């Protein structure tokens, strides 16, 4: 395999990488989209996302679903995983975590379209669902429903 590929600039993939201590320290990496010009949707699901309540320091848990229609760039999945892991010791409200993730990806990728659904498990008896998207979904791409059921508890 040639040394000069679309992957040659990646620093984290294929090597030991420590989990960043904060989302600000986390490095998201991107690769050229080998299917640029072909409309398609990419989905990442993080069913065990964790952050901390900024007031109590107690853990908060969410099921995240990230969908995007790429343009020139794809997010490198290991860097995304490490970025998401960096929230484990980060104190922020659910809304801030969800929207921050979406905006960081938009800044990095400049996608045709992106949405993130943050389905947060209850704290204080109330589940919070947070949704962010960059605009109307493209009509020429199949974008499935996120498929996360409303929280029902034991019900």
Curated annotation (Swiss-Prot):
Enzyme Commission number(s) of this protein: 1.7.1.13
Keywords on record: Cytoplasm, NADP, Oxidoreductase, Queuosine biosynthesis
Disulfide cross-links: none
Single GO term (MF): preQ1 synthase activity
Pathway this chain belongs to: tRNA modification; tRNA-queuosine biosynthesis
Active site (record annotation): 53, 60
Any one of the GO CC terms: cytoplasm
InterPro entries: GTP-CH-I_C/QueF (IPR043133), NADPH_dep_7-cyano-7-deazaG_red (IPR050084), QueF (IPR029500), QueF_type1 (IPR016856)
Residues that coordinate or bind substrate: 75-77, 94-95
Subcellular location: Cytoplasm
Pfam families according to UniProt: QueF
Highest taxon above the source species: Bacteria
Annotated catalysed reactions: 7-aminomethyl-7-carbaguanine + 2 NADP(+) = 7-cyano-7-deazaguanine + 2 NADPH + 3 H(+)
Glycoprotein among keywords: no
Any one of the GO BP annotations: tRNA modification
NCBIfam families on file: QueF-II (TIGR03139)
HAMAP family, per the entry: QueF_type1 (MF_00818)
Family, as annotated: Belongs to the GTP cyclohydrolase I family. QueF type 1 subfamily.
Described function: Catalyzes the NADPH-dependent reduction of 7-cyano-7-deazaguanine (preQ0) to 7-aminomethyl-7-deazaguanine (preQ1).
Protein name (database record): NADPH-dependent 7-cyano-7-deazaguanine reductase
């Amino acid at each position: 395999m040639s040394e000069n590929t679309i992957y040659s600039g990646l620093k984290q993939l294929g090597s030991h990488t420590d989990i960043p201590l904060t989302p600000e320290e986390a490095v998201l990496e991107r690769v050229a989209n080998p299917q640029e010009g072909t409309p398609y949707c990419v989905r990442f699901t993080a069913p065990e996302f964790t952050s901390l309540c900024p007031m109590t320091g107690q853990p908060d848990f969410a099921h995240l679903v990230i969908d995007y229609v790429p343009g020139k760039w794809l997010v490198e999945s290991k860097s995304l995983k490490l970025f998401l892991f960096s929230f484990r010791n980060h104190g922020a409200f659910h809304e801030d975590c969800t929207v921050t993730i979406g905006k960081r990806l938009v800044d990095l990728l400049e996608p045709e379209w992106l949405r993130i659904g943050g389905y947060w498990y209850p704290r204080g008896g109330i589940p919070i669902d947070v949704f962010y998207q960059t605009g109307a979904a493209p009509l020429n791409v199949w974008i499935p429903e996120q498929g996360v059921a409303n929280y029902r508890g034991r019900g």
